[in-house]
Amino acid sequence: MDVMTLATIPSPPQGVWYLGPIPIRAYAMCIIAGIIVAIWLTRKRYAARGGNPEIVLDAAIVAVPAGIIGGRIYHVITDNQKYFCDTCNPVDAFKITNGGLGIWGAVILGGLAVAVFFRYKKLPLAPFADAVAPAVILAQGIGRLGNWFNQELYGAETTVPWALEIYYRVDENGKFAPVTGTSTGEVMATVHPTFLYELLWNLLIFALLMWADKRFKLGHGRVFALYVAGYTLGRFWIEQMRVDEATLIGGIRINTIVSAVVFAGAIIVFFLLKKGRETPEEVDPTFAASVAADAVASPDGKPLPKAGEGIDGETPSTR
């Protein structure tokens, strides 16, 4: 065994465990963990902007199932050759636990669901979008760990020290099962861990969004526009490294084209949107009024923080 082999990144021996007859899938656990973290962070950020944090959980109940459905639909459409061919089983298109979610489908359908929800609540969408943007990119990073367990979304073979080992996995009958099987210990190939590249990129964009939001006091949807631009920039170059089967348009992977188009659109939208940040009264006037009333009625005589105070050490008057 040489030094390069010692330096490679091992894949997990399996991505599915069983609790009796119930399968526990690492891919699903990573998605759930990402959702939980996103809800927690969004509650803090939305409350700091002056919104009612309880709205976040309500929005998540609407957005999460819509996002998962949208993500799966986008994946099946853009990777239809995996489900609709002479040797394919179309029923596999519904087996979401085997992996396969397209982020753009999740953002579009999940975003539409949230937009309808906020319209029903008669609240502006932009402050929530800005609050949720860093949380979404962080959740995406956590979710990418699921690709590691599934041994999917990797790049070309390589001998770099951080190459990922892809194991030969088999099911209980000894048949090849790269996603649901258990490793035999045989290394089929060492490849570029593109899932890891995207995970690290997502964490970088998360940090940049948090910094930019604090430094420039962004609002009116500009944080969300930056999230879209940042993610698509990374997805554009990472997509070039992937070798998994994908739909091509003019010899170019469809997600490469989508990333380029969406990146350009996000940059344009960012500069068109209004500068500055909304006041708590603009974010949720009813909640802001109730917080102000509670502050006046504080039993110990000490005024409570107003809605929106605390974000980046600001008060409404300094925005």
Curated annotation (Swiss-Prot):
Residues 295-319 are annotated as: Disordered. It is an enzyme of class 2 (transferase). Its EC number is 2.5.1.145. One of its GO terms (molecular function) is phosphatidylglycerol-prolipoprotein diacylglyceryl transferase activity. One of its GO terms (biological process) is lipoprotein biosynthetic process. It is found in: Cell membrane. Keywords: Cell membrane, Membrane, Transferase, Transmembrane, Transmembrane helix. Belongs to the Lgt family. HAMAP family: Lgt. Catalyzes the transfer of the diacylglyceryl group from phosphatidylglycerol to the sulfhydryl group of the N-terminal cysteine of a prolipoprotein, the first step in the formation of mature lipoproteins. This is Phosphatidylglycerol--prolipoprotein diacylglyceryl transferase. It comes from Corynebacterium glutamicum (strain R).
